[in-house]
Amino acid sequence: MQTPPESTDVKLDTLNEPSAHLIEKNVALPKDIFRSYLSYWIYEIARYTPVMILSLVIGVLVLLIIFFNDNEACVFNSAIFAFTSLVGLLIILSDGNPKLVSRRNFRTELLVDVITRKPAVEGKEWRIITYNMNQYLFNHGQWHTPYYFYSDEDCYRYFLRLVEGVTPKKQTATSIGNSPVTAKPEDAIESASPSSRLNYQNFLLKAAEIERQAQENYWRRRHPNIDALLKKTE
């Protein structure tokens, strides 16, 4: 397994840095660090405390069954507890999106970063956003490693689920680009308090507007004649 470059320690709290494109090239995500998704998955599981505890319990119970196989009561009770622990372990392993990562402060942090950077569909900005979110989860104790999102695609899919069903007010690309953003990424935790629910909804609507415009730009680049095709179907 490779080690992340020292440049990943660069602070990316603002977008005022003139060399943002250079920072993006040096940001290392888990998919760049690990040889495969399997090695990444094993690394994450091995550092997840509930998994380690349950694995240790199962191991001890199996040893009890082996060494005390002539004691029916011990074997029976150990087998019951081992089976229960195994079920719990499988439930934890199958939980790919823990509740910790659905906390309002994290979602607000993600929305503010999207609003600030205005990423394109499949844009390089998503690498920086993903790196920031991984660092945020780790630094705030919401995840046990700084590698929650394996790739920028994973973070982007999470964002799409977040804004799914949100109907933004239709704006032009110019109006979106010129709209003032009064919130800063470091203010996201405060904005996520229960008394600031309206701010969160505003962030959600704004991020949905940016994503809608990014989708329009993406499909227009891929199909320059899309407007003519749409007129024919009317």
Curated annotation (Swiss-Prot):
It is found in: Endoplasmic reticulum; Golgi apparatus; Cytoplasmic vesicle, COPI-coated vesicle membrane; Cytoplasmic vesicle, COPII-coated vesicle membrane. InterPro entries: DUP/COS. Coiled coil: none annotated. One of its GO terms (cellular component) is Golgi apparatus. Residues 69-72 are extracellular. Residues 1-47, 94-234 are cytoplasmic. Keywords: Cytoplasmic vesicle, Endoplasmic reticulum, ER-Golgi transport, Golgi apparatus, Membrane, Phosphoprotein, Protein transport, Transmembrane, Transmembrane helix, Transport. It comes from the Eukaryota. The modification Phosphothreonine is found at residue 3. One of its GO terms (biological process) is protein transport. It is a multi-pass membrane protein. Its main location: endoplasmic reticulum. Residues 231-234 are annotated as: COPI binding. Involved in protein trafficking vesicle formation, probably by stabilizing of coatomer at the Golgi membrane and thus allowing the efficient formation of COPI coated vesicles. Members of the DUP240 multigene family are specific to S.cerevisiae sensu strictu. Cells lacking all 10 DUP240 proteins show no obvious alterations in mating, sporulation and cell growth. Belongs to the DUP/COS family. This is Multicopy suppressor of SEC21 protein 28. It comes from Saccharomyces cerevisiae (strain ATCC 204508 / S288c).
